[in-house]
């Protein structure tokens, strides 16, 4: 089925930016943070000091204007023309399988957006044929890192970034 935003409108394929609003951590937005002594902040976190946070785009190579739950997606920060800020999942202690931004994207992204409760969860597929793994939150150092936590997804509502 079609993924819809908080206005009930279909989420667009790459054209629009959206805020991911966590259902259970409503006063936090997406931001970037460091893990350990990294030179640059590349880990995706929910930060209570960042609202509404960094907007994301959902991109599928399919020539269709809207996003459906069955589609493999790239999720990324930044403009659609750029390949920076693309989400991936990378093993990094002490977080585990952490969501981090990279400068490369595969044609078919490794994520799907799937209905969960009153919102949507992000599901990571390490391989096409494998079972998906829920993206949840790992709490460290006053931040909530997005990471694989299967069975404990973080549920988001998707709000179009132009709707202030």
From Swiss-Prot:
State if Secreted is listed as a keyword. yes
Thermal behaviour (record text): Thermolabile.
Q: Which CDD domains match?
A: beta-trefoil_STI_BbKI-like (cd23364)
Q: Which GO terms describe its cellular component?
A: extracellular region
Which locations, inside or outside the cell, does it occupy?
Secreted
Q: Which InterPro entries match?
A: Kunitz_inhibitor_STI-like_sf, Prot_inh_Kunz-lg
Q: Which controlled-vocabulary keywords does the entry list?
A: Protease inhibitor, Secreted, Serine protease inhibitor
- GO molecular function list: serine-type endopeptidase inhibitor activity
Secretion signal span:
none
- State what this protein does: Inhibits bovine trypsin, human plasma kallikrein and plasmin and weakly bovine chymotrypsin.
| Family to which this protein belongs | Belongs to the protease inhibitor I3 (leguminous Kunitz-type inhibitor) family.
* Protein name in the entry: Kunitz-type serine protease inhibitor BbKI
Species source reads Bauhinia bauhinioides (Perlebia bauhinoides)
């Amino acid at each position: 089925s079609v993924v819809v935003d908080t206005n009930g409108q279909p989420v667009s394929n790459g054209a629009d930016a959206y805020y991911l609003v966590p259902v259970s951590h409503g006063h936090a937005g997406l931001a970037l943070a460091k893990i350990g002594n990294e030179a640059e902040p590349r880990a995706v976190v929910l930060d209570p000091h960042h609202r509404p946070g960094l907007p994301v785009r959902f991109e599928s190579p399919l020539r269709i204007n809207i996003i459906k739950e069955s589609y493999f997606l790239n999720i990324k920060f930044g403009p659609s023309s750029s390949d920076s800020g693309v989400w991936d999942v990378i093993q990094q202690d002490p977080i585990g399988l952490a969501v981090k931004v990279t400068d490369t994207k595969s044609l078919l992204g490794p994520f799907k957006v799937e209905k969960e409760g009153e919102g949507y969860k992000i599901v990571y597929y390490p391989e096409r044929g494998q079972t998906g793994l829920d993206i949840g939150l790992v709490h460290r150092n006053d931040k909530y890192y997005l990471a694989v936590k299967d069975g404990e997804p973080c549920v988001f509502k998707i709000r179009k970034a132009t709707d202030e």
